[in-house]
Structure formats: structure tokens, C-alpha cells
Design a protein with these regions (language model features):
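Histidine-acidic metal/acid-base catalytic patches
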Residues: 1-6, 11-13, 20, 53-58, ...
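N-terminal ordered "arm"
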Residues: 15-21, 25-40
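Glycine-rich, positively charged N-terminal anion/phosphate-binding segment
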Residues: 15-16, 25, 43-63
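Glycine-rich, proline-tolerant flexible connector loops at the mouths of alpha/beta enzymes
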Residues: 34-50, 219
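Conserved beta-strand edge residues that scaffold enzyme active sites
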Residues: 36-37, 70, 110-111, 214, ...
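Acidic/aromatic-lined carbohydrate-recognition and catalytic surfaces
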Residues: 65-99, 103-123, 127, 134-145
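Extended, charge-rich helix/loop segments that form flexible
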Residues: 111-188
């Protein structure tokens, strides 16, 4: 088998790009999808899954990769109610397996998913890109959230990880996460994984965690998957072939000290799904997302793809972010 090229699709009514549009992109076999109307902790019902999978199959694509089934905050915080939401998550896994899903991407980031300070930063050629300005990420999480949510309202769409229902409870969430140290978050991640691994084995679905984006603590919130050492810890903490990575070159290379190609070569057998994203770094620590051509950033796209090729990678890989 060889690697499969995927493309993320946000679904009818939430994505201006149609499946017919994606069909025009050479080599794309896999649609990476999700039920974007579902809140973390809710069960994905079989009828809802079937509706989207049928649309994808009718367009001539596979639908084996889901990005993402988000994890409820009670699980991350370690509240007594987490077991209820873990059971719901296990039922999602079972239901997805009935429709051929083999990989579930998820993350374990507290409160915020990906974080950027500018969603439309001018690149210089007339395009725009996501931008992270280090000095803007201080203690004022509300201003950043309001900025990103303004585009949710303007474009009538939901950004993954920035659901309005959750953002309306930011103060409550920060209070709930206050006692959660980095080690406690590791413990809660291990508890979650050990609880769902039997279901993953039963259903033949791999859980593929996305690294923290960016890979450092923000607003006093701990981040776990930030470098090669933390990835080693994650994979050995629950050493199961169904405990895997969604390796994101852009998230990892937001820290230029991370060698993504080396991580690929070390853990290729635990990477069923990969994101290829290029990053341009500034000397002051800011970064911008860039075009995927190797020379447009400092991520080392050629070396990363060579590593996947050399390792015989046979999972799904997709282009990630870039410019608009």
C-alpha cells in the first residue's frame, strides 16, 4: 500500500468548497470529515454518520479518517463526570466503525484548540495567512477569543475548537482548569486512553492525537504534545498500536527546534494520519503559515516527505492550512 492523499471537508452548509470542487484536485482519494454540529461529549448517531459518509462515497471518495471527535472538558480536567463522557466517546467509536472509519484525530488541549492572533495576515503577494504574534498572547484571552469569534459571526461558520457554546463559558472554563497542572493533565490523558483502547481494538480504529498548536503553554494553560520527548512519553505511556499520532508538521515546527523528519523516522508505524503544513519564522518568535513549497518556509517539507517515503508510510496525508 502507498500513502493516500486526503482533503479536509467541513460539510454541506459549513464549507464553501464542495465535494465536486475537491474532485478536481488530482490524487485526492480520502475526504477527512467530521460532524461539526456536534458538541464535545455528544454521541454521534449512526444516522448522522451515514448521511455524511454516503455523500462522500457518492462523490467517489473514501471516508475512513475523521477529524475530529473532540474530547469533553470534564475528561481533560478529570472531573467525576468524566466516565459518562468517556462512555459516550466509546459509543462514537463503535458507531463510526460501522461505516468504515479507521482513524480518529483528536487533541487534548485545554480550552483552546489552535491559537492565532491574526486570521488574515497579508503575505505580500495578495494572499493572506494565519499569523501568531507572540507579544499579543499575554493574559487577555478574552480579546483573542472575541477576535476569532467575530469571524464565526461574519462568515456564518464554526471554527473547529472554537465553538460559540464553549467560548461563552470562558471564565468558567479557566476556573475549572486552574488546579490542573501539566502532570495532572498527563494523568487525565492516560486515564482516557486506557479507558478507550479496548474499544479501539474491538472496532479496529486508531486514535491519532494532534500536537498542541502552538507547542507551548498559553494563558497559563499547560500543553503536553510539544516536542520529540513528549511524543516519546505519550507513545510509551499507553504503548498500544491503536494509540497513535496525527503528526502535524506545522504545529511541531512552530518551535523551530523540533525536527519533524526525525520524528517521522522514529515513529512512522504509529502515524496513521499526517498534516503537511509549512511555517515561516521571524527572529522575534512570531510565525506565519506559508505556502507548501519547501522554500516558502523553514519546516523542511522535502525532508519530511522523504522521511515518509523512506519509511513506507501507508496512512492518509493531507495538505494543511497554507494561504488564502
Amino acid at each position: 500500500m502507498s500513502m493516500k492523499m486526503g482533503w479536509r471537508w467541513y460539510g454541506e452548509g459549513n464549507d464553501p468548497i464542495t465535494l465536486s470542487d475537491i474532485k478536481q484536485i488530482p490524487g485526492v482519494e480520502e475526504i477527512v470529515w467530521a460532524l461539526h454540529s456536534k458538541m464535545p461529549g455528544e454521541i454521534w448517531e449512526e444516522a448522522e454518520i451515514k448521511e455524511v459518509v454516503d455523500q462522500i462515497h457518492a462523490a467517489g471518495f473514501d471516508a475512513t479518517v475523521v477529524e475530529s471527535v473532540n474530547v469533553h472538558d470534564d475528561i481533560k480536567i478529570g472531573l467525576p463526570t468524566r466516565d459518562k463522557y468517556i462512555e459516550n466517546y466509546k459509543q462514537c467509536i463503535r458507531n463510526l466503525s460501522k461505516f468504515g472509519v479507521k482513524t480518529i484525530c483528536y487533541n487534548f488541549m485545554p480550552i483552546f484548540d489552535w491559537t492565532r492572533t491574526d486570521l488574515f495576515h497579508p503575505v505580500g503577494d495578495g494572499s493572506t495567512a494565519l499569523f501568531y504574534e507572540k507579544d499579543k498572547i499575554k493574559d487577555d484571552y478574552k480579546s483573542m477569543a472575541e477576535y476569532i469569534m467575530s469571524f464565526t459571526e461574519k462568515y456564518n461558520m464554526t471554527f473547529p475548537g472554537w465553538e460559540p457554546e464553549r467560548m461563552a463559558k470562558l471564565d468558567e472554563l479557566f476556573k475549572a482548569y486552574a488546579p490542573v497542572t501539566k502532570e495532572k493533565l498527563w494523568d487525565n490523558l492516560k486515564y482516557f486512553l486506557e479507558a478507550i483502547m479496548p474499544t479501539c481494538r474491538e472496532c479496529d480504529i486508531k486514535m491519532a492525537i494532534h500536537q498542541d498548536d502552538p507547542p507551548w503553554d498559553i494563558f497559563g494553560l499547560p500543553r503536553l504534545l510539544v516536542d520529540a520527548e513528549s511524543i516519546d512519553r505519550f507513545l510509551t505511556m499507553v504503548d498500544d498500536p491503536y494509540n497513535c499520532l496525527t503528526l502535524c508538521s506545522g504545529s511541531m515546527n512552530a518551535n523551530p527546534n523540533n525536527n519533524v523528519a526525525a520524528i517521522v523516522r522514529k515513529h512512522c508505524d504509529r502515524i496513521p494520519f499526517a498534516h503537511v503544513r509549512n511555517i515561516h519564522h521571524f527572529e522575534n518568535g512570531d510565525f506565519s503559515e506559508a505556502a507548501h513549497r519547501d522554500c516558502c518556509g523553514e519546516t523542511g517539507i522535502i525532508e519530511i516527505l522523504r522521511a515518509y517515503h523512506d519509511c513506507g508510510f501507508d496512512g492518509c496525508i493531507r495538505a494543511d492550512h497554507g494561504r488564502q
